[in-house]
Amino acid sequence: MDYTQILIKPLVSEKATFVKESSEQVVFFVNPRANKIEIKKAVESVFNVKVAGVNVVTRKPQARTKHGRVTGQTAGYKKAYVTLAPGEKIDFFEGV
């Protein structure tokens, strides 16, 4: 899998911002078929940083019901919490 297909987009939320400030971690939405090794190599090659570790959270699609009937599914996704090596930094929205 190509590195540009692994990282979908960075996650920007209150929790992701808190994690980024408290520990040297960055959160990404990633391709559901990507594994930890591929995610690590993709972040290192795209952002030119050293990665200390990767934790992955997978959310499966949930059935949506309306008036007792199943109407579809919510989207499933995979998030990667990437821990950067000490001294490394990725600036997404600095100064915004």
UniProtKB/Swiss-Prot annotation:
Membrane-spanning intervals of the chain: none
Keyword Ribonucleoprotein carried by entry: yes
SUPFAM superfamilies in alphabetical order: Ribosomal proteins S24e, L23 and L15e
PROSITE patterns linked: RIBOSOMAL_L23
GO annotation, cellular component aspect: ribonucleoprotein complex; ribosome
Top-level division of the source organism's lineage: Bacteria
GO molecular function: rRNA binding; structural constituent of ribosome
Keywords assigned by UniProt, alphabetized: Ribonucleoprotein, Ribosomal protein, RNA-binding, rRNA-binding
GO BP field: translation
InterPro entries named in the record: Nucleotide-bd_a/b_plait_sf, Ribosomal_uL23-like, Ribosomal_uL23/eL15/eS24_sf, Ribosomal_uL23_CS
Oligomeric and partner information: Part of the 50S ribosomal subunit. Contacts protein L29, and trigger factor when it is bound to the ribosome.
Family indicated by similarity: Belongs to the universal ribosomal protein uL23 family.
Function, in words: One of the early assembly proteins it binds 23S rRNA. One of the proteins that surrounds the polypeptide exit tunnel on the outside of the ribosome. Forms the main docking site for trigger factor binding to the ribosome.
NCBIfam families (UniProt xref): PRK05738.1-3, PRK05738.2-4
Protein name (record): Large ribosomal subunit protein uL23
